[in-house]
Amino acid sequence: MTVGLLYNKNKKESVHYVKLLTEAIVEISRRESAGREIWHVIDSADYRQDSAAASADLLISIGGDGTFLKTAAIAILRELPVLGFHLGTLGLLTEFEKNDLEKTVLRLVKGEYVIEERMTLRITVNDGEKNVFEKSAINDCVLSRGTLSKVAYIDLYINGAFVDTYPCDGIIVSTQTGSTAYSLSAGGPIVEPGNDVIVITPICAHYTDGRSIIARSTSKIEMRLCRPHRQMYVTADGYASMQIAPDAKVVCERGADKLRIIRIDPPNFYEALRRKTSERRARIHNEE
């Protein structure tokens, strides 16, 4: 078994933790298999991250949710399961804390885990002639205005039916996984991971009826600019972004790929949500 470790090598805490994790994987696999199958570790600091994944049987993300999303994008392309160790300030995708290292590795080596599948979004931007942007997202697609630009007027369609024109700063289209990310900050609903849905949440809608919509996962979501706008951007999972033309069409629908997350002790979602948000508040107060 070969494990690929992906992390931010510019963070000292991550580098130190990777060393401990590597030693634990090799030592525990040697002990549990009586030397018959020692697990191998590929450190992404020594390779390009996608190259590290090419030879791996599973990936481990070390860091926060941002690191996990980037690792997960590679895992989806390689059809690999991914496990997340949490080192950040708020982790709802990363199940395991850094203090759980040996216990987690032992359960992993012994095969005592399950694979949880999550849906993805397929995002396309069409300029009227061809697709100019095609990405997969685990959390969300965001269509938003530039920092200094005016209010945007966005037409929303679901399965070809016109829903409304939203005067707003943008619209977030998220999976159930992304419902606890940017969508939640914009006032969107919290959706349990087991429910495959698409959540549509306007950002700072300029009227009182700008509520979120929960659509079926099979729905086709389409966004167009009702009025020309100079600075509009589409972003996938917060890191893949491009400026779109005034007549462009943004389409979000269920992706063919699935994210496969390794779960050892499947957490109670609401307990994890409460614990993580409480930890974040405590850390913010301690920094003041």
List where the protein language model places each region:
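ATP/nucleoside-binding phosphotransfer catalytic cores, i.e., glycine-rich phosphate-binding loops
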Residues: 143, 148, 159-162, 211-288
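Short glycine-rich anion-binding loops that position phosphate/pyrophosphate groups of nucleotides
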Residues: 65-67, 90, 177-179
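ATP/NTP phosphate-donor binding region
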Residues: 1-58, 62, 98-114, 125-135
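Short aromatic-centered micro-motifs
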Residues: 156, 178, 234
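N-terminal glycine-rich "phosphate-gripper" loop used for MgATP/nucleotide binding
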Residues: 61-65, 72-74
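Catalytic core of DAGKc-family lipid kinases
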Residues: 92-169
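Gly/Ser/Thr-rich active-site loops/lids in small-molecule metabolic enzymes
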Residues: 165-168, 172-209
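Gly/Ser-rich helix-loop-strand patches that form or flank binding pockets
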Residues: 70, 74-85, 90-92
